[in-house]
Amino acid sequence: MQVTVEDLSSVKKVLHIEAPAEDVKKALDSAYAELKKQAKVKGFRPGKAPRSVLERLYKSDVESDVAGEIISDAFRDAIMETKLKIVGPPEIEPPAIVSDEPYKFDATVEIFPELSDLNLKEIELSKNMYKATEQEIENQIAMIRKNMSSLETEEEDRPAKEEDFVLIDYEGVCPDGQPDELRFTENFTMELGTGRILKDFDAQIVGMKRDEEKDFEISFPEDYFNKELASKQVKFHVKLKEIRKQILPELDDEFAKDLGEYETLDQLKDSIRDHLQQGYDRRSEQELDEQVFQALLNRVEFEVPETLIKHETASMVSEAERALSYRDMTFEDTGATKEDMEERYREPAEQQVRRYLLLDKIVEQENVELPEEELENAFKGMAESLRQPLEIVKKYYASDAEQMNMLRQTLLQKEALKYVKNLNEIKEVELELQETEE
């Protein structure tokens, strides 16, 4: 077998492969010999049909099968000889076999880029030190109180105002028909001012009294989440049946106890503070990681195989599709197609692939190893997240070598990132209050 490599780019090659004529002849002879044993040809006893007859009847199928075998074997040998680290399957258009001649074919492949050694030092890094504020804690408690509140009918005969809860019947009519959402709806509870349907809708109800009925028109904006109502003028008829006031629980130790995990209000506040701080700490670390990536990407240039970009894009699109499915939605419900989403995610997918390739290079260059305790911690984290016994998680990975290798590689990449950060001085930046509020 002969092979030459033609460079299309640093990550795309064409292998010009030639299998010798004797290999072709041997493969054809073997194929016809096997066919002769099995073929049932009219006028001949089993195993007695001459090759000329078999060629007349089965030549196309035999040569197609033989070409596939030669390509598979020769391509495998070519990869071993050239030592190319290919990405994904090759692109091959099998030519026809010509008897007694070498079999020549081209295989277009993508390969992993070869990154030059990286300078991992002298990277200017700063870490934003976010801190959970008392106001954020109070906001969280306010949300919990609201979720634990009850509603009481307002006995006073007064107009409805913002932050009231109201019980209404309503019906909407569009010029071109009635979307299901606008058909007569009875005993609908809503909080005024939140814009559950539309803030303009709430504004029309503010000022109404119990048992009052009202007709009004609302224009839905172009970007309204329900595309059936976007840009439409809708006539509504509303009857206000009750005004209800929200009764919040007292903010004391009993309030904390009712949540089932705390004995005092201070314990609840401490728990909220810890939870918020954990989120801020993760944010700080993610921002720091991104600084490392950007610094290293500025120090090395390399092409990314299209195969890897497409694979990562598909993964991101699938994740977005899965997230929407949890809300019983599809891409079409958001006004986008799958092709739109693929285009949207292509650039972030390429950046993510670059990060993976950088981390793999660091692992190789610096001989980064995975401490066994990190693997154990990963198993424990998954067991806790999935609410499964630790041994079940370990057994799953022990039975699936591919999944285990993927997990180890992911953890190794984290170790590589940690390695780079440990090589460089990190300046901690305490942020002012207004910078942490969102």
Curated annotation (Swiss-Prot):
Main location: cytoplasm
NCBIfam families in UniProt: tig (TIGR00115)
InterPro entries, per the entry: PPIase_dom_sf (IPR046357), PPIase_FKBP_dom (IPR001179), Trig_fac (IPR005215), Trigger_fac_C (IPR008880), Trigger_fac_C_sf (IPR037041), Trigger_fac_ribosome-bd_bac (IPR008881), Trigger_fac_ribosome-bd_sf (IPR036611), Trigger_fact/SurA_dom_sf (IPR027304)
Protein name per UniProt: Trigger factor
Subcellular location: Cytoplasm
Function: Involved in protein export. Acts as a chaperone by maintaining the newly synthesized protein in an open conformation. Functions as a peptidyl-prolyl cis-trans isomerase.
Keyword line: Cell cycle, Cell division, Chaperone, Cytoplasm, Isomerase, Rotamase
Notes on the domains: Consists of 3 domains; the N-terminus binds the ribosome, the middle domain has PPIase activity, while the C-terminus has intrinsic chaperone activity on its own.
Catalyzed reactions: [protein]-peptidylproline (omega=180) = [protein]-peptidylproline (omega=0)
Gene Ontology annotations of biological process type: 'de novo' cotranslational protein folding; cell division; chaperone-mediated protein folding; protein transport; protein unfolding
EC number: 5.2.1.8
Molecular functions (GO terms): peptidyl-prolyl cis-trans isomerase activity; protein folding chaperone; ribosome binding
Similarity field: Belongs to the FKBP-type PPIase family. Tig subfamily.
Species of the source: Desulfatibacillum aliphaticivorans
PANTHER family: TRIGGER FACTOR CHAPERONE AND PEPTIDYL-PROLYL CIS/TRANS ISOMERASE (PTHR30560), TRIGGER FACTOR-LIKE PROTEIN TIG, CHLOROPLASTIC (PTHR30560:SF3)
Enzyme class: isomerase
Domain called PPIase FKBP-type: residue spans: 163-249
